[in-house]
Structure formats: structure tokens, C-alpha cells
Amino acid sequence: MLGMRTVQPLDPSLIYLLLRSNGDAQPIQGGDAFWSMPKTELEQHGQSWLVSEFSCSKNWPSWEMHPIADELIYLLSGEAEFLLEKPEGLQRIHVVESGLVIVPRGIWHTAQVSAPSRMFLITMGAGTQHRPA
């Protein structure tokens, strides 16, 4: 018999989800608790899809690149311009209030935030690289 899970609402800014390849959705502590994990743990979790939400009122402090899979960034509220370094040049995607941006794997990207924003992200983070903005 399969184990039963308790179904309850989760705040994706506090509790992230790991979508495992076996179909499981595993809740995991989010926010600073997640990002302060040892690098080896983060890399292990990066083999799954990470579903998270965060709020920001300033530009992202760094560029990032995800080599394994595309990243989905859904702006829930606010205003931001997403910068993608594509082979053909810099692409700017301006989003106000609501919109989904698909960042292709292997593309360096960052965000310039024009108004306090909430973003919902789905990322496979294994091998993610960062550099200063």
C-alpha cells in the first residue's frame, strides 16, 4: 500500500518543492535555510526541479546560468526587466504585473527590478554558475 501524504497549503516562499524524477513532490525548507545548505546538498537537490517563490525590490546581485535545463520565471506582481545573454546579443524582456519568461539552458541571465516584485521560479539547478552583475 502506498503511503498517504497529508495535503495542506504551502507558502512557496518558505517551503520549496523538489519535483523528483520518480514523480514525487518533496517539500523542503526554503529561503535562507535552503540557500545556506552545503554546496554538495544544493547540488544534489539541483538534480530535481526546484519550485520556489521570492520577493525582491532590488536588482539581482549576480548573473546566473543553468546548464542542465531551461528555467521558468513567472512574475506574479511588480515590474522587472530580464536580461538574457544570447549568442546573437543581449535580449531584454520587460514584464509588468504578470508574465512568464523562459530562460533557455546555458544562457546567462539576471533581472533589473523596477518595482517591488514577487517571482515564482521552476529551476533545475545542478551545475548552476554565478558571476557578479
Which residue stretches match the model-derived regions?
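Short histidine-centered beta-strand/loop micro-motifs
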Residues: 40, 60-67, 84-85, 92-93, ...
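Structural motif
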Residues: 79-81, 99, 118
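Short, conserved beta-strand element in jelly-roll/cupin
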Residues: 67-82, 86, 122
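Double-stranded beta-helix
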Residues: 2-18, 26, 110-133
